[in-house]
Amino acid sequence: AKGATGIRVFGLQLPGATLADAHAAWGDELKVAMMATRGEPPVLEATVDNARTGPVSGRLLFTADASPQALQRWRDNALKEEPVSADTRRIALRGVDQAEALRTPLVGIGFIPSTQLDAAALRSRFGEPAEVLRGAAEVEHWMYPATGLAVALDARGRELLQYVAPADFERR
């Protein structure tokens, strides 16, 4: 839903919510970690693997805005790093670092529905996009800047709905 200064999505206000707010909403289902992909700076993320939002279930992905200094300190103190792909590692945070990480503001919320969506379902739920961009292979990016939503519509894979504050849409 659209708010005066941003949007409210999955019960959280963007901008304004922190990872602690996500933890309050999702409890121990929320898993916080740093993700480091080769050639890119690490990012602070949190996931809920089995989230139900109304009639649809799927995976929630929260992106937080941690400073490069905090990310480096947390990585230096990390409990462990484990590979999630050839180029990406998940970095577990120590308790004191996780407590600090929970205070970081959310900048984006993603949702990967467990069921396949199609163009008709997107139009029914969100209306006509302001713009449709062609991506790689069979992926289209449906842009809804007024509501802070970008959807990656994948003819062969899972869709990704990404929410940011409308004021941050172009930047993110």
Which residues does each PLM region occupy?
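A cross-family detector of function-defining hotspots
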Residues: 19-172
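Glycine-centered tight-turn and secondary-structure capping sites
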Residues: 15-16
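Short, recurring structural edge motifs at helix starts
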Residues: 6-12, 108-111
